């Protein structure tokens, strides 16, 4: 399990406007965390296209969608159902750049 892997994850139960249901999500936590903790940080994928500055377009399994960086969360690894793919290094770098903008002062 490494940064950039895409897993089918169970995001239920949720509250309010949190992205829900079982869906693909990309692991964004660093590999050291992924090896040592029982949790991972993920960003869910969605097929609903929104013009938000902190979403990044993607194509996964031949479907166009977005990575919802405004919906990142920490999950117990028990919520990971199965690995369904991964993203390339350029896409991961794009994700990390956007996350840096989110968390910079």
Task: Give the location of each predicted region.
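Conserved functional hotspots at enzyme active or ligand-binding sites that engage polyanionic ligands
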Residues: 1-105
């Amino acid at each position: 399990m490494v940064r950039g892997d895409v897993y089918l994850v169970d995001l239920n139960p949720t509250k309010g406007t949190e992205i829900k249901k079982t869906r693909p999500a990309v692991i964004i936590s660093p590999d050291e965390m992924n090896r040592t903790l029982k949790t991972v940080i993920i960003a869910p994928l969605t097929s609903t296209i929104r013009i938000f500055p902190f979403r990044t377009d993607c194509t996964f399994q031949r479907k166009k969608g977005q990575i919802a960086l405004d919906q990142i969360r920490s999950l117990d690894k028990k919520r990971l159902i199965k690995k369904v793919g991964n993203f390339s290094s350029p896409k991961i770098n794009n994700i990390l750049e956007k996350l840096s903008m989110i968390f910079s002062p």
